[in-house]
């Protein structure tokens, strides 16, 4: 298929951020008496917004999930990301290749807040590829797994969502891309399992950004 545009998720696709974010989340849950490993935290929360998991969090901490707590989480998370964020291996070449193939019609469509996304992309030298074409699920009526952020990105690029390629790394994000009508390829950073990604609707799973190419 000749794709007219490529829409990227951010966390876990462009930047290696998910373990950093979940490390902060795990520490803050432990302060409230809910203990889990980093791996358990990632299994529960990667691909989801914290607010969307309110019922689960309150059931396990016994404490209301307040706006003040969320703000503290965002602040602590941002400090760690600014200090430790890195790009996914080989992603700069992949993004440049896809931008050239699609005549610059590439965008970021993230479930995360805009400040976080733009800060991370600047830190790793990817922001210029996407300047003016960064979309946040926090600014949409609904976030992933709903398709709103992908539909907004496609509309801005003036392309049919069905002619877009979406690059994702979680079942929740894949579901959003599929719901938008796009074809979804999933990046599975080893040792991530492939089956949940295929089950969610990914047409292809790849394990290295060096192989993300269009003919």
Model-based region annotation:
Residues 46-79, 97:
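A metal-dependent, Asp-based hydrolase signature
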């Amino acid at each position: 298929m000749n794709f007219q545009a490529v829409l990227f998720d951010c966390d876990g696709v462009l930047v290696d951020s998910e373990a950093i974010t979940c490390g902060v989340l795990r520490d803050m849950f432990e302060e409230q008496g809910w203990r889990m490993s980093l791996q358990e935290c990632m299994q529960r929360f990667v691909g989801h917004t914290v607010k969307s998991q309110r019922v689960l969090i309150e059931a396990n901490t016994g404490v209301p999930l307040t706006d003040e707590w969320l703000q503290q989480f965002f602040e602590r998370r941002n400090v760690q990301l600014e200090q430790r964020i890195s790009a996914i291996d080989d992603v700069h070449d992949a993004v440049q290749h896809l931008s050239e193939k699609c005549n610059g019609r590439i965008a970021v469509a993230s479930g995360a807040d805009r400040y976080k996304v733009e800060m991370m992309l600047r830190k790793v030298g990817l922001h210029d590829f996407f300047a003016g074409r960064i979309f946040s699920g926090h600014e949409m009526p609904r976030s992933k797994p709903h398709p709103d952020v992908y539909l907004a990105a496609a509309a801005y690029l003036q392309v049919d969502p069905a002619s877009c390629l979406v690059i994702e790394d979680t079942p929740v994000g894949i579901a959003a891309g599929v719901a938008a009508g796009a074809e979804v390829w999933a990046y599975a950073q080893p040792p991530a399992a492939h089956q949940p990604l295929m089950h969610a609707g990914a047409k292809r799973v790849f394990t290295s950004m060096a192989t993300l190419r269009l003919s």
